[in-house]
From Swiss-Prot:
Role: Together with BIIDXI, acts as a positive regulator of PME3 activity during several developmental processes, including seed germination and endosperm (testa) rupture at the micropyle, probably by modulating the pectin status in cell walls.
GO biological process, one term: regulation of cell wall pectin metabolic process
Taxonomic lineage of the native organism: Eukaryota, Viridiplantae, Streptophyta, Embryophyta, Tracheophyta
Pfam families according to UniProt: DUF642
Assembly description: Interacts with PME3.
Protein name according to UniProt: BIIDXI-like protein At5g11420
Length: 366
């Protein structure tokens, strides 16, 4: 009986561990594409068997790319590991994953364009989908990390990454690597902050070896944000940065406004008409060689505040606050950077001021 009990406990322990692994945040099975096709499933760089790459199903013209491979005069570099995949015209990759129905999830993946065309990616988990433009390159390596969110409609999610492009040269398709997932837990307002997720602690998965931050593109038409409670209301992306690779004013995460007035973030808060509120926040730099004069513009309804910040590119921050009287039951809080900035160490990577620790509280009467 004792041996039977031990056997049962062992089986239960294994089942528990398996369950935890199944739903843990991190890289998808073979999300880095390091497990590749057999030589018999290849024709040059093209993968000719739709199930040749473990854990993935392919459709259309998909290439298996080795780091250092040449495309004309261009050397193709992989951000991590040795391999990535390239999606030709109308090509796609997909993977089915066990999830929890009703939960919110964020996908993170690396992408790089290989030609001058206006390349885009269509990311979908039915019924949600979104088109992500990758024409703008934010880092000097050519690779950027992107995030996209969805809500699980069932216990199985079919994740599809599709290239909707129609380039004349199929070799002009985008490169994909490092596909990861993270469960999102929508935050709630508290008696210490009317805004939700004001410290940006809840957000997309950041790959441990990623030193560029994660781009959250504009999702005006999408139902879910990978940065819960916040909307990217601009033409360009904002960047989600972590304390492991950047200077962060508070906690472990923050947001970098990397594209001037084209990079804005907003949240709508419930307010009482005629009541006075104080919007407070931190402005700084990410310790990423982003130097020079910066200005963050903060908006609360019809009121605005410009906060200058002189950056040496070595980290640091200052605090600011905006006092206003609510004129509506719903007040839009928004931030953007007045100027465009480039990193001084490579002059090709977009950067900008960091905002963090955003709080909205009702003010006491004097």
């Amino acid at each position: 009986m004792k041996g039977g009990s031990l056997s049962f406990l062992f089986v239960l322990l294994i089942a528990t561990i398996t369950s935890v692994i199944c739903f843990s945040d991190g890289m998808l099975p073979n999300g880095d594409f390091e497990l590749g096709p057999k030589p018999s499933d290849m024709k040059g760089t093209q993968v000719i068997n739709k199930k040749a790459i473990p854990s993935w199903e392919l459709s259309g013209f998909v290439e298996y790319i080795k780091s250092g491979q040449k495309q004309g005069d261009m050397l193709l570099v992989v951000p991590a590991g040795k391999f990535a995949i390239r999606l030709g015209n109308e090509a796609s990759i997909k993977q089915r994953l066990n999830v929890t129905k009703g939960m919110y999830y964020s996908l993170t993946f690396s992408a790089a364009r290989t030609c001058a065309q206006d390349e885009r990616l269509n990311i979908s988990v039915a019924p949600d989908s979104g088109v992500i433009p990758i024409q703008t390159v934010y880092s000097s390596s050519g690779w950027d990390l992107y995030a996209w969110a969805f809500q699980a409609e069932s216990n199985v999610a079919e994740i599809v990454i599709h290239n909707p492009g129609e380039e004349e040269d199929p070799a002009c398709g985008p490169l994909i690597d490092g596909v990861a997932i993270k469960a999102l837990y929508p935050p709630r307002p508290t008696n210490k902050n009317i805004l939700k997720n004001g410290g940006f602690e809840e957000g997309p998965y950041v790959l441990p070896n990623a030193t560029t931050g994660v781009l959250v593109p504009p999702f005006i038409e999408d139902d879910h944000s990978p940065l819960p409670a916040w909307m990217v209301e601009s033409l360009k992306a904002i960047k989600y940065v972590d304390v492991e690779h950047f200077s962060v004013p508070q906690g472990r995460r923050a947001v970098e406004l990397v594209a001037g007035k084209e990079s804005a973030i907003a949240q709508v808060a419930r307010t009482v008409v005629g009541k006075t509120y104080v919007l407070s926040f931190a402005v700084g730099d990410a310790n990423n060689a982003c130097q020079g004069s910066m200005v963050v513009e903060a908006f609360a309804g019809k009121d605005t505040l410009k906060v200058p910040y002189e950056s040496r590119g070595k980290g640091g921050f200052k605090r600011a606050s905006l006092r206003f009287v609510a004129v509506s039951t719903r007040t839009r809080v928004m931030f953007y950077s007045t100027f465009y900035s480039m990193r001084s160490d490579d002059f090709s990577s977009l950067c900008g001021p960091v905002i963090d620790d955003v709080k909205l509280l009702s003010a006491r009467k004097p």
